Amino acid sequence: MINYDLNKIKAIIFDIDGVLSCSTINLSEAGLPLRTVNIKDGYAIQLAMKLGLRIAILSGAKVESVRVRYEGLGVEDIYLGCAVKISTYDEFLAIYGYTDEEIMYMGDDIPDMEIMRRVGCPVCPKDACAEVKAISIYVSDIEGGRGCGRDVIEQVLRAQGKWVMNEKAFGW
């Protein structure tokens, strides 16, 4: 269980590689990266948005397939190719007027740490690097790309009394 007042959470920001996709990347014959994503993460993401949580994607990756996947789920805040993530995070806060305490961030590696040190609720997948685990309030029992996003979304929605309590839960 996440040791944080999850009723404070208004937005969840996810990294992609190692969080919503596993830590390996297959390459196409043309050398393009192919990522695998978890369908349960996808269901939880679209449900969370229907129930009032803002979901954002913040990644160093520049792959258009990532944008297509998450736009297809209804995610509006997709930030790709972020070399330094903290400046994009600050822009996100300014756009919506959020405070750090209202944000959950799920990351898995060194580039995520600057944001994770600021947010109210830093979380990570089971296979995150040791440095990220050390600063996380919660380490999921699930590895990146295997449903760790669903894990944290479900905990937030349950804490807020919204998990499967609504007709919106029964459809995409």
Task: Give residue spans per PLM region.
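N-terminal charge/polar-biased segments
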Residues: 1-5, 162-165
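Alpha-helical substrate-recognition element adjacent to the catalytic core
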Residues: 2-84
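Mg2+-dependent phosphoryl-transfer enzymes with acidic/Ser/Thr/Gly-rich catalytic loops
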Residues: 31-34, 73, 77, 86-172
